[in-house]
Amino acid sequence: MKELLRLKHCKHLLTTHVHSPWTPSLTLTPSLLTLDTLTHPRHRHSSPWTPHSAPWTPSLTLDTFTHPDTLTHPGHPHSPWIPSLLTLDTLTHPGYPHSSPWTLSLTLTPSILTLDSLTPHPGLPHSSPWTPSLLILDTLTQPGHPHSSP
């Protein structure tokens, strides 16, 4: 069961929680993500996140997530995430129309997300489906453009 999530705050990845499903109202500390409300995807009465100052709209759709260290392509056999784990507004799961799939072995490093703005790669100013005020991932690249870091 997919849940609609919206981030309230994003900070540093200073700790990891290996193979530990997220629980209601979980706060990852120190300084990873401070989130309003989260219930496990199998919970029947889970609530969507409530954005406050977040400048973007329906942000993340996750099925199950247990390992915040790495994020890999849903087809990758060694991914700790299951298929369809993540769908962004304009950066979505492969197979969805007008989507831009995640690359293999996307690593969430310090400064995981910058919510203020996103600039396309300088060499590809018109190829990115990302919009301003969405997010920046440190090691996210476009398929076919492995060196196009934000």
UniProtKB/Swiss-Prot annotation:
Protein's name in the database: Placenta-specific protein 4
Expression by tissue: Expressed in placental syncytiotrophoblast and choriocarcinoma cells.
Superkingdom to which the source organism belongs: Eukaryota
